[in-house]
């Protein structure tokens, strides 16, 4: 599959300052990257930071706000990674000084780049922990309902399996980035979601609505 026709999925998160505005700015900047065409942006979900409070590695901090962006790219994974690292820097992230598992003004993960595979210290594609994270799978399913990961696993089936394992995140639906008051955010229309308020998605129900089979 050529890069021009490959689905690219990116996971974005933030929990420092005005996290919604940070996410909105990141989406806008992604759309300005040469060779990247943003197609759809998920609803915003809130999740507790990891490790949890009962873990000795836990760092006290606010919950994260997370989204998944679906795009098409004519650039490869390495060039896209370089672009996302630069966007993180522009939005205030300092990877050299930040605390491990600490708060982040912005975090951009390359989750899937078509059927490309990389396994290097600086870049692993597809992201190795997609199937372990409801805050990735739920918004990914929203923007990529028929999505199939490079290993052949359907995104919906991965979400059902995660829910059945009992290790799914305490994920809350927050709203949409279109609720952010900014004149500059250029965002494509996406699946409908509540404009405000919190609700916990029923993960198995969400997945089954998108055709998962167990």
Give the predicted meaning of each segment.
Residues 2-10, 16-105, 114-115:
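Nucleotide and nucleotide-moiety/phosphate-recognizing core
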Residues 35, 50, 59-64, 81-214:
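Flexible, gly/pro- and Lys/Arg-enriched active-site loops
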């Amino acid at each position: 599959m050529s890069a021009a026709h490959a689905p690219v999925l990116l996971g974005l998160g933030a929990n420092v300052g005005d996290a919604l505005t940070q996410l909105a700015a990141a989406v806008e900047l992604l759309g300005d990257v040469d060779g990247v065409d943003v197609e759809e942006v998920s609803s915003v979900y809130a999740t507790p930071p990891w490790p949890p409070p009962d873990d000795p590695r836990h760092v006290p901090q606010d919950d994260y706000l997370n989204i998944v962006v679906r795009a098409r790219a004519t650039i490869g994974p390495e060039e896209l990674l370089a672009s996302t690292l630069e966007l993180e820097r522009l939005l205030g992230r300092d990877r050299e000084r930040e605390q491990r598992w600490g708060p982040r003004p912005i975090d951009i993960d390359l989750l899937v780049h078509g059927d490309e595979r990389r396994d290097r210290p600086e870049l692993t594609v597809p992201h190795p922990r997609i199937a372990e994270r409801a805050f990735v799978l739920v918004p990914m399913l929203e923007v990529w309902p028929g999505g199939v990961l490079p290993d052949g696993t359907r995104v919906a089936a991965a979400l059902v399996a995660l829910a059945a394992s009992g290790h799914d995140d305490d994920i809350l639906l927050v709203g949409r980035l279109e609720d952010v008051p900014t004149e500059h955010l250029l965002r494509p229309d996406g699946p409908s979601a509540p404009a405000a308020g919190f609700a916990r998605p029923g993960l198995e129900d969400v997945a089954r609505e998108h055709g998962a089979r167990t």
